[in-house]
UniProtKB/Swiss-Prot annotation:
Highest taxon above the source species: Bacteria
Gene name, Swiss-Prot/TrEMBL: dnaK
Protein's name in the database: Chaperone protein DnaK
Organism of derivation: Halalkalibacterium halodurans (strain ATCC BAA-125 / DSM 18197 / FERM 7344 / JCM 9153 / C-125) (Bacillus halodurans)
Record keywords, A-Z: ATP-binding, Chaperone, Nucleotide-binding, Phosphoprotein, Stress response
Regions of compositional bias (Acidic residues) in chain numbering: 599-614
Record-stated family: Belongs to the heat shock protein 70 family.
Length: 614
C-alpha cells in the first residue's frame, strides 16, 4: 500500500511527516528545514512557496500570508488580475509539501491525513478537503490538531492519563481534554477561538512600534506598505527573542523619510512591556480552557499532564498562565512545531495498518441543528458529542396544507438561528395537504469521522426523502474543484517547465564560459578555421540567451557542444602528444648518458707512503 503522509497545514508554518520503521518522522524540505512557511508569492506569473516567498514578502505586494484564517469564507485574493480562493492558495502550499514528500520518499504520494483546528466548523473542514483535492491529494481523514498532538504524545504511553492539549498556533487557538491509555484516545471536550493566534501577538508589537514612532516623528507608518512589512518581520523576531531574553533591541534604519531626511526606528522592547501589551490575548485563551474543563466534567486538579502545541506556546506569559490555571508545569517533551504533523502521520499509519491497536474517538466542536418556528435554533447534536454519530428528530409543518418545508442547517451555540453559522439549506417538497402539525418530517444528522455533516429530511407519510451533504455558502462545486485541479496541474507543469528553462539557460551560460576558456587554452594550437567556427557558434548561443528564446538556446547549445567536444578532443590529443614527446626526449637523454659511461676507463692506483720515499 502506498504511503499516506500526515500534514499540519498551519497558519504561519506547515509541516509534513510520514511513518517510517514504525515511527513518525518529519520530512525536511529541500532547504533543510523541518517546517515550511505557509506563504505563497506570485511574481511575473511564477509561483513561489515557503522560505523563498517569505524572504521577498517585503518588496512583493503579491504575497499571501495566513490564508488559513480565511478558510471556509468567501474571501478572495486578487493577484495579477486573477482571483484566488483560500482553497486554491492552500492547495499551492499542499502541492509544495506533497512534492517535498515525494522527493524524500522517492515515490508518488496521492493520499494524506490533514489536520485542522478542533474548533473549525463544517465549512472550514470542507474547504480544507477541497484544498487537498485541488493539490492532487485524496484526503483520507481530517484530524483535529490537539487530537493529533495527543496521538503523537501518547502513542508510547501505557498508563491511563487525562491530558489537556493547549494549542496556540499562528492564527487559531484550541484546547482539548483527552483520556488516553494503552492505544485508546478519547476526546472528552474541545473548545477554542479561530481568530486568536501568534499573528495577534505580533500585531500588538506592530501597533506599539507605530504609536511610538508617530509620537517621536509625527509620521504614521501604517500607511506605508513596505514599512509595515519590515515592522511585521521585526515584531515576529522580537516576540521570539523575548521568549529567551528579557529585552530586545528593534533597529530599522531608513524606515521612512520626510522633508528633513531619512528616519530610523530604534526602540528597546522589554519582556515586561510585551506581556503588558499582550495580556488581554493571554486572558482570551483561558476562557475556552475553562469551558473545556467544564464540558468534560473535570476539575483542573484531575488533569495529569498539560501538553503545549504551537510555536506561540513558547511565550513565557502563556506558559505561566496555563500553569496558574491548571496547577501543572506544562510538559516540554514534544516539539510544539512538529507534534501535530507527527500525530497526523500516526493517524495515517492507523489507516494503512502500520500502527495497530489504536482507537481514536474524537468529538464535534459545535452543536448542530435546524431553524424552527420563530427563528429558534433547535439542536439535534450537542457539542462534544463523540463522532462519527447520527441523530434523528421528528418535526412538523407550521401552517395548514403546507406543501414543502425549508430545512435551514446551522452550527453554533446561540439560542437564535440568526446568531449561528449557516451550513446550508434544502427543501423537502410534495407534502400532501394536511392540517398544521399533522405531517411527520424526520430530520437526521450524520457526522462522519472527519467532522463533515450530512443531513436528510424524510416525510414519514409518503417516505419521500431529500438529503444534503453540507458545503458551505463559500464551498466549491465539483465543477469548480475539477477546474482548480486542472489549473493546479497546469501550474505544476508550468513551474516544472520554468525550472527546466532556468537550468537550460544556466547550462548555456556555463558552456559559453567553458568555450572561451578552451579557446584561450588552445591558443595557436588549433586551425584558424576551427577557431572561427567555435567563435561563431558561441556568439550564436550568446545572442539566443540575450533574446531569451528557449528553442534557439537549445539548438545553439547543442551546436556549440559538438564544436567544443571536437576542440576538447584536440586539446587532449595535443596534451597526450606532448607527454609522449617529453617521454621520448627523456628516453634519448638516458641513452646518451649510458653511452658516455662506456668510454670511462677504470684506473688502478697505489698509495705511496711518505716515509718510504725518504
Amino acid at each position: 500500500m502506498s504511503k499516506i503522509i500526515g500534514i499540519d497545514l498551519g497558519t504561519t508554518n506547515s509541516c509534513v511527516a510520514v511513518m517510517e520503521g514504525g515511527e513518525a518522522t518529519v520530512i525536511p524540505n529541500p532547504e533543510g528545514n523541518r517546517t515550511t512557511p505557509s506563504v505563497v508569492a506570485f511574481k511575473d506569473g511564477e509561483r513561489q512557496v515557503g522560505e523563498v516567498a517569505k524572504r521577498q514578502a517585503i518588496t512583493n505586494p503579491n504575497t499571501v500570508i495566513s490564508i488559513k484564517r480565511h478558510m471556509g469564507t468567501n474571501h478572495k485574493e486578487n493577484i495579477e488580475g486573477k482571483e484566488y480562493t483560500p482553497q486554491e492558495i492552500s492547495a499551492i502550499i499542499l502541492q509544495k509539501l506533497k512534492s517535498d514528500a515525494e522527493a524524500y520518499l522517492g515515490e508518488e504520494v496521492t493520499k494524506a491525513v490533514i489536520t485542522v483546528p478542533a474548533y473549525f466548523n463544517d465549512s472550514q473542514r470542507q474547504a480544507t478537503k477541497d484544498a487537498g483535492k485541488i493539490a492532487g491529494l485524496e484526503v483520507e481523514r481530517i484530524v483535529n490538531e490537539p487530537t493529533a498532538a495527543a496521538l503523537a504524545y501518547g502513542l508510547d504511553k501505557e498508563d491511563d492519563q487525562t491530558i489537556l492539549v493547549y494549542d496556540l498556533g499562528g492564527g487559531t487557538f484550541d484546547v482539548s481534554i483527552l483520556e488516553l491509555g494503552d492505544g485508546f484516545f478519547e476526546v472528552k471536550a474541545t473548545s477554542g477561538d479561530n481568530k486568536l493566534g501568534g499573528d495577534d501577538f505580533d500585531q500588538v508589537i506592530i501597533d506599539h512600534l507605530i504609536a511610538e514612532f508617530k509620537k517621536e516623528n509625527g509620521i504614521d507608518l501604517s500607511q506605508d506598505k513596505m514599512a509595515m512589512q519590515r515592522l511585521k518581520d521585526a515584531a515576529e523576531k522580537a516576540k521570539k527573542d523575548l521568549s529567551g531574553v528579557t529585552s530586545t533591541q528593534i533597529s530599522l534604519p531608513f524606515i521612512t523619510a520626510d522633508a528633513t531626511g531619512p528616519k530610523h526606528l530604534e526602540l528597546t522592547l522589554t519582556r515586561a512591556k510585551f506581556e503588558e501589551l499582550s495580556s488581554h490575548l493571554v486572558e482570551r485563551t483561558l476562557g475556552p480552557t475553562r469551558q473545556a474543563l467544564q464540558d468534560s466534567g473535570l476539575s483542573a486538579s484531575e488533569i495529569d499532564k498539560v501538553v503545549l502545541v504551537g510555536g506561540s506556546t513558547r511565550i513565557p506569559a502563556v506558559q505561566e498562565a496555563i500553569k496558574n490555571l491548571t496547577g501543572k508545569e506544562p510538559h516540554k517533551g514534544v516539539n510544539p512545531d512538529e507534534v501535530v504533523a507527527l500525530g497526523a502521520a500516526v493517524q495515517a499509519g492507523v489507516l494503512t495498518g502500520d500502527v495497530k491497536d489504536v482507537v481514536l474517538l474524537d468529538v464535534t466542536p459545535l452543536s448542530l441543528g435546524i431553524e424552527t418556528m420563530g427563528g429558534v435554533f433547535t439542536k439535534l447534536i450537542e457539542r462534544n458529542t463523540t463522532i462519527p454519530t447520527s441523530k434523528s428528530q421528528i418535526f412538523s409543518t407550521a401552517a395548514d396544507n403546507q406543501p414543502s418545508v425549508d430545512i435551514h442547517v446551522l452550527q453554533g451555540e446561540r439560542e437564535m438561528a440568526a446568531d449561528n453559522k449557516t451550513l446550508g439549506r434544502f427543501q423537502l417538497t410534495d407534502i400532501p395537504p394536511a392540517p398544521r402539525g399533522v405531517p411527520q418530517i424526520e430530520v437526521t444528522f450524520d457526522i462522519d469521522a472527519n467532522g463533515i455533516v450530512n443531513v436528510k429530511a424524510k416525510d414519514l407519510g409518503t417516505n419521500k426523502e431529500q438529503s444534503i451533504t453540507i458545503t458551505s455558502s463559500s464551498g466549491l462545486t465539483d465543477e469548480e474543484i475539477d477546474q482548480m485541479v486542472k489549473d493546479a496541474e497546469a501550474n505544476a507543469e508550468a513551474d516544472k517547465k520554468r525550472r527546466e528553462e532556468v537550468e537550460l539557460r544556466n547550462e548555456a551560460d556555463q558552456l559559453v564560459f567553458t568555450t572561451e576558456k578552451t579557446l584561450k587554452d588552445l591558443g595557436d594550437n588549433v586551425d584558424e578555421a576551427e577557431k572561427t567556427k567555435a567563435e561563431e557558434a558561441k556568439e550564436k548561443l550568446k545572442k539566443a540567451i540575450e533574446a531569451n528564446n528557449i528553442d534557439e538556446i537549445r539548438t545553439a547549445k547543442e551546436e556549440l557542444q559538438q564544436v567544443v567536444q571536437a576542440l576538447t578532443t584536440k586539446l587532449y590529443e595535443q596534451a597526450a602528444q606532448q607527454a609522449q614527446q617529453a617521454q621520448s626526449a627523456e628516453g634519448d637523454q638516458g641513452t646518451a648518458e649510458k653511452g658516455q659511461d662506456d668510454n670511462v676507463v677504470d684506473a688502478d692506483y697505489e698509495e705511496v707512503n711518505e716515509e718510504d720515499k725518504k
